Amino acid sequence: MRVADFHFDLPEALIARHPLPERRASRLLALDGPTGTLAHRQFADLLDYLRPGDLMVFNNTRVIPARLFGQKESGGKLEVLVERVLDQHRVLAHIRASKAPKPGTRILVEGGGSAEMLQRHDALFELAFAEPVLPLLERVGHMPLPPYIDRPDDAADRERYQTVYAQRAGAVAAPTAGLHFDEALLEAIRAKGVDTAFVTLHVGAGTFQPVRVERIEDHVMHREWLEVGQDVVDAVSACRARGGRVVAVGTTSVRSLESAARDGELKPFSGDTDIFIYPGRPFHVVDALVTNFHLPESTLLMLVSAFAGYPETMAAYAAAVAQGYRFFSYGDAMFITRNPAPRGPED
């Protein structure tokens, strides 16, 4: 399969650069996978697509203010984007500077704080901060908005680039499908008889990296840490027993569940995943999906195409562009039921 098969033209004006005033005010494009039928709704109408007995699985990762500005002790300015917190003081980070720092270089953080560059791991730098890193980031860090939101972060992003159920700090990008849910909607979902469960996948900056090969099969995915607990396994089992559907909120929840079921059976799992889901790959757990609109030629668009079928997905995206839907992290959403016989671009 060619990466170019997943290209579509997106007008710049459809990229959402700010969130709407209310989380649930987004639009919802519903795609019935088996038939390809589309329905244009509001996100609050999601309740109409859920059934008593269903299970919704959310990603409860918490975005950390992972972007720091500062300078080398020698004076050269730099920008740090934390990719992964290793322990209380050490992180792996991307560094943007005119000249890459060498081991032993001391970095002075704008707003207070310092770190030492310990060693380089390919594209990432291992840094040791003089004080506990998470409180430091909360104090002087900036929210790591995606590269397509071409503006500085502001105070509102601290709240809105975060789900209302975020708990476990470690992500450097939001699980954006979850941004549409407020407490009232979650309460209404539970009141309808829909169960909820939470996985954790700390979304890395690699989620925004373009696919740099021509053929999908040659792409190597970035690694991200996730955890699927026994409680989630039990909730899925109970859902299956009562005839309900597993509804994943976001592609990160899909990747978590399917990573924990690579041999066909869902089991507790904690560790790194590099799962790459593209057309032709089976789904063992997820029956329906809530997701935002993704970048052209991205691995997430490939995942959606594997779930709903390639022709159905690309037709839905064409309709979304024609109808002026808002795209990407702060944009609108889709509700998709799985296509039992999805076709790829070459079928």
UniProtKB/Swiss-Prot annotation:
It is found in: Cytoplasm. The gene is queA. PANTHER family: S-ADENOSYLMETHIONINE:TRNA RIBOSYLTRANSFERASE-ISOMERASE. GO terms for cellular component: cytoplasm. It comes from Pseudomonas aeruginosa (strain UCBPP-PA14). It comes from the Bacteria. SUPFAM superfamilies: QueA-like. Pathway: tRNA modification; tRNA-queuosine biosynthesis. Keywords: Cytoplasm, Queuosine biosynthesis, S-adenosyl-L-methionine, Transferase. Its main location: cytoplasm. Its EC number is 2.4.99.17. This is S-adenosylmethionine:tRNA ribosyltransferase-isomerase. InterPro entries: QueA, QueA_dom1, QueA_dom2, QueA_sf. Transfers and isomerizes the ribose moiety from AdoMet to the 7-aminomethyl group of 7-deazaguanine (preQ1-tRNA) to give epoxyqueuosine (oQ-tRNA). The keyword Flavoprotein does not apply. GO terms for molecular function: S-adenosylmethionine:tRNA ribosyltransferase-isomerase activity. It is an enzyme of class 2 (transferase). Belongs to the QueA family.
